[in-house]
Amino acid sequence: FHGYTYSGIPVSVAAALAVQDIFEKEDIFNRAKELAPYFQEGLFSLKDIDVVDNIRGYGMMGGIDIKTDGRPGKAGLATFKHCYDAGVNFKATGDCLIIAPQFICEKKHIDEIIDKLRTGITNYQKNQKN
């Protein structure tokens, strides 16, 4: 047998099978599919913030581009810090905020994410004016 150090480890295989069982029993993918339009609606509600340049999304994933001041990455990092201080964590790449809520979330969690994103992005915007 030839494989990799991470191939065929019984504990890992058992864990993966258990996760698949949970996804099937709790209908995780269909729950996420049903929540996706609600998440997208919340995400696109942020387009009224002046520093938001572009919003795009698909399913339970979204990207928010922050307008730059000519220095790539600076606006994205600063916005990320304001959002983190507001209580939401995500990936920021360059000037794009990448949002992907967990599949197990509920509407109340999406509301919280969007509220904290709004707070963080708005705080960044206010800081830019000072």
Predicted regions and their residues:
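Conserved N-terminal phosphate-binding loop of PLP-dependent enzymes in the Aspartate aminotransferase
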Residues: F1-N130
